């Protein structure tokens, strides 16, 4: 990878971590569209592994309720890797512009859900029945696009969870998915020593962005900044969807 590309990757990681520090929006989801525009989806996916796992582990440590949450959603977490491996097979078969368009659609759905923040509630029995399908589908979308938020995010939002349990549930899912994704990427030949080294370089930029973003949280209008970032991601997602026809 050229020096210019490494600088772009580091810049995307810094910005995504800075945004995460201020708003709590997902690191990978924010960084991914910038990387796709710069270097392509298949090239971008392995670079996110190390920073994603590290950032998720930090949040998992701080959120608490680990064992309780792990047991509550164990079937969902066990199902996600199955979908990831299927999704990676599909990714290797798909035309890159199509998989990028799917990512764009996922980003649009994510932004709409995040902006609207629906308050619907799933009945307990239905939520239980949907655990495995949601896990497999989230893994499938993850394998094809690299995004880990759909449909697990709206699913967890539909449950009566406390904020800490919700954050922990999301981050356990992200961490399990990232580890399975790393194994899958290595299996299909995308996660190599070179990409690992670049991923560690990006980790430094991510940590700096997170450190600088977190103290600013109380000084900026959190809601306005969050909506601005979501609006930007929405535009980037729309661009990825329209790209094959432009």
Question: Which residues does each PLM region occupy?
Answer:
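Selected transmembrane alpha-helices and immediately adjacent juxtamembrane segments
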Residues: 1-38, 121-170, 177
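Structural signature of hydrophobic alpha-helical transmembrane segments
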Residues: 5-6, 11, 36-53, 97-107, ...
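Hydrophobic residues within alpha-helical transmembrane segments
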Residues: 11, 15, 50-57, 74, ...
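Juxtamembrane helix-boundary/capping and inter-helix hinge elements in multi-pass membrane proteins
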Residues: 38-41, 63-70, 157-165, 189-192
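Residues that define the loop-to-transmembrane-helix transition and helix capping
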Residues: 42-45, 97-100, 129, 164, ...
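Hydrophobic alpha-helical transmembrane segments in multi-pass integral membrane proteins
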Residues: 44, 86-91, 140-147, 181, ...
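Selective hydrophobic functional segments
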Residues: 47-96, 179-223
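Transmembrane helix exit motif
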Residues: 56-65, 96, 102-127, 214-215, ...
């Amino acid at each position: 990878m050229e020096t210019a590309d490494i600088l772009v990757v580091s810049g995307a990681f810094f910005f995504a971590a800075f945004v995460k520090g201020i708003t709590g929006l997902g690191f990978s989801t924010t960084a991914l569209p910038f990387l796709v525009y710069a270097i392509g989806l298949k090239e971008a996916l392995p670079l996110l592994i190390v920073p994603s796992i590290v950032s998720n582990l930090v949040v998992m440590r701080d959120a608490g309720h680990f064992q309780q949450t792990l047991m509550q959603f164990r079937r969902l977490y066990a199902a996600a890797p199955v979908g990831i491996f299927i999704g990676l097979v599909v990714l290797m078969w798909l035309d890159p512009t199509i998989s990028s368009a799917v990512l764009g659609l996922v980003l649009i759905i994510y932004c709409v859900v995040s902006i609207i923040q629906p308050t619907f509630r799933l009945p307990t029995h239905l939520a239980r029945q949907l655990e495995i399908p949601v896990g497999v589908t989230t893994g499938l979308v993850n394998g094809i696009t690299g995004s880990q938020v759909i449909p697990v995010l709206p699913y967890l939002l539909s449950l009566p969870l406390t904020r800490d349990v919700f954050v922990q549930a999301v981050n356990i899912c992200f961490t399990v998915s990232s580890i399975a994704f790393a194994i899958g990427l290595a299996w299909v030949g995308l996660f190599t020593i070179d990409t690992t080294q670049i991923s560690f370089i990006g980790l430094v930029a991510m940590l700096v962005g997170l450190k600088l973003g977190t103290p600013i949280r109380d000084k900026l209008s959190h809601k306005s900044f969050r909506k601005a970032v979501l609006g930007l991601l929405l535009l980037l997602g729309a661009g990825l969807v329209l790209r094959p026809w432009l």
